[in-house]
């Protein structure tokens, strides 16, 4: 038994589950005409319908009691106050300070961090204006037309997702490119599209030692210098987001063009910081500020709304209901908007790197499930790929259906078809189709007898598949900021319930350590390290293939 599983609310929910697991949402809707109105809420430009979940008032009552018994109120306050809730690294967790639009003091070790936050935002704004206005010129006195962001993980996924999502708001002269993969192909193909005279490289690495990022950055630098043939020109075409001024200067980047962030900003929560420089360059300072404003709206709601009307808390606790009671090991993100095509990958890192943990804060092994596998694709594409499994497969995979009510970028007639599919899928997942309904349908098609009965089981949909429908008034910087912050806080809440640290990522370290040794073997700097027979054979195959 762990701290969590000993809580009275945890045990009470198991008693409730014994009855609730037999309920069907179709019956719940039939018995309660007001269900949709009661199980929905709006925050800023976001509307959440969570009525199509396997929940009742008793379920929600039990889940909110579990949140309180797990200490969620105190943990929310601790995060916003700047307490060092990342215990394994002894750090505060203050991505919320980066969008603290009230500018009220937030202290770390007694120091108000807001002056530094505002100073970096001001520098970012001035630089973005210079690039966007054409005042910032390359080594041949031409304005910048292409921006190549070089980073990985949180230094790539966040800026890439936001720039893709808000493309209609981007500067018409600027083309955005993102390079993260160290395989060489991504950088090679990117460099084919850009010109050294008009390209700005943004190198994003907190330590400026990340192997993948530095490998790509050095290769980009070599490519640039092969054309510019002047080391001094690097300063006009490379800027850095880092904390390592010495390494940045050695690279050839003017320290005046290094934008700082801090150890209380986790990588996957960093797009609000200087890591968001590519976003500001592309969208402009005003739109970046709107992104922050949207996140701040959700922050204030999360801090102040009662749990029963708190959007992040509701999503988190309903998620706990499926993960820990129904055994639902995956969760689907299905945005019905092509501009949001990178959102599933972004949420995947945000959730799985945060809560994919096997021990509690006290270091004890968990005796319950933690983070689900997050996956997904744009909704329409998903319907023709994996929705078959979601409708008739054997897994319980809750689905977030995300769309915008207004879409200024859509072509005439397209948006209505899109939204019809969103609403239809939510209804289909909930209702399903009974055997009698299938028989009636087949009878209308002229089938009967054995021929009909042979088809019936294949065309039955069990329904009772949970969905959340998240609708934005429109996809714009403010609403996207709120949406991202919603998921950040949902993930935080689940981490609190499970008594785990959502803000470290030790699981990524072992592979990095082993890769250094194996790299030395592949490049001939080390003859043979100790490995298992499989790894040794793989190394031998590489050596044989490469002479």
Swiss-Prot record:
It catalyses: alpha-D-glucose 6-phosphate = beta-D-fructose 6-phosphate. It is found in: Cytoplasm. Its main location: cytoplasm. The keyword Transcription regulation does not apply. One of its GO terms (cellular component) is cytosol. PROSITE patterns: P_GLUCOSE_ISOMERASE_1 (PS00765), P_GLUCOSE_ISOMERASE_2 (PS00174), P_GLUCOSE_ISOMERASE_3 (PS51463). InterPro entries: G6P_Isomerase, G6P_Isomerase_C, Phosphoglucose_isomerase_CS, SIS_dom_sf, SIS_PGI_1, SIS_PGI_2. Pathway: Carbohydrate biosynthesis; gluconeogenesis; Carbohydrate degradation; glycolysis; D-glyceraldehyde 3-phosphate and glycerone phosphate from D-glucose: step 2/4. HAMAP family: G6P_isomerase (MF_00473). Belongs to the GPI family. This is Glucose-6-phosphate isomerase 1.
């Amino acid at each position: 038994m762990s701290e969590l599983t000993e809580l009275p609310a945890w045990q009470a929910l198991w008693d409730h589950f014994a009855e609730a697991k037999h309920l069907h949402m179709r019956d719940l809707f039939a018995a309660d005409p007001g269900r949709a109105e009661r199980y929905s809420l709006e925050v800023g430009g976001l509307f959440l319908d969570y009525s199509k979940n396997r929940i009742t008032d008793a379920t929600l009552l039990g889940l909110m009691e579990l949140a309180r018994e797990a200490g969620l109120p105190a943990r929310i306050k601790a995060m916003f106050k700047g307490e060092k809730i990342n215990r394994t690294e002894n750090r505060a967790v203050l991505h919320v300070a980066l969008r603290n639009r009230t500018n009220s003091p937030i202290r770390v070790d007694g120091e108000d961090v807001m002056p530094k936050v505002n100073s970096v935002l001001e520098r970012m704004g001035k630089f973005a204006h210079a690039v966007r206005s054409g005042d910032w010129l390359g080594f041949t006195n031409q304005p910048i037309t292409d921006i190549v962001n070089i980073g990985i993980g949180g230094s790539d996924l966040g800026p890439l997702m936001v720039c893709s999502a808000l493309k209609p708001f981007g500067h018409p002269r600027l083309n955005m490119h993102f390079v993260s993969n160290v395989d060489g192909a991504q950088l090679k193909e990117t460099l084919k599209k850009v010109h050294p005279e008009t390209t700005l490289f943004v190198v994003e690495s907190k330590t400026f030692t990340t192997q993948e990022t530095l490998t790509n950055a050095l290769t980009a630098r070599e490519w640039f210098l092969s054309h510019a043939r002047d080391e001094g020109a690097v300063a006009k075409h490379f800027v850095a987001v880092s904390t390592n001024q010495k390494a940045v200067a050695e690279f050839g980047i003017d320290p005046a063009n290094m934008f700082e962030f801090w150890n209380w900003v986790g990588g996957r929560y960093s797009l609000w910081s200087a890591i968001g420089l590519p976003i500001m360059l592309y969208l402009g300072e005003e739109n970046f500020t709107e992104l922050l404003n949207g996140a701040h709206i959700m922050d204030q709601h999360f801090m102040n709304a009662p749990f029963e009307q708190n959007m992040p808390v509701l999503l988190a606790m309903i998620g706990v209901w499926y993960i820990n009671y129904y055994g639902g090991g995956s969760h689907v993100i299905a945005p019905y908007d092509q501009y949001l095509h990178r959102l599933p990958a972004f949420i995947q890192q945000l959730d799985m790197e945060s809560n994919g943990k096997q021990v509690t804060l006290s270091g004890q092994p968990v005796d319950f499930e933690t983070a689900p596998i997050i996956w997904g694709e744009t909704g329409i594409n998903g319907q023709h790929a994996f929705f078959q499994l979601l409708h008739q497969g054997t897994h319980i995979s809750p689905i977030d259906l995300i769309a915008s009510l207004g879409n200024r970028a859509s072509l005439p007639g397209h948006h209505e078809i899109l939204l019809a599919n969103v609403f239809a899928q939510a209804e289909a997942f909930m209702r399903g189709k009974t055997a009698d309904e299938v028989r009636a349908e087949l009878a209308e098609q002229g089938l009967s007898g054995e021929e009909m009965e042979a088809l019936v089981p294949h065309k039955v949909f069990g329904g009772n598949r949970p969905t959340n429908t998240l609708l934005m008034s429109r996809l714009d910087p403010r609403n996207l900021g709120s949406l991202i912050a919603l998921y950040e806080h949902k993930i935080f809440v689940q981490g609190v319930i499970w008594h785990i640290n959502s803000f470290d990522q030790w699981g990524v370290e072992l592979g990095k350590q082993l890769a250094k040794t194996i790299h030395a073997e592949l490049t001939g700097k080390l003859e043979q390290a100790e490995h298992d027979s499989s790894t040794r054979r793989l190394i031998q195959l590489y050596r044989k293939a490469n002479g």
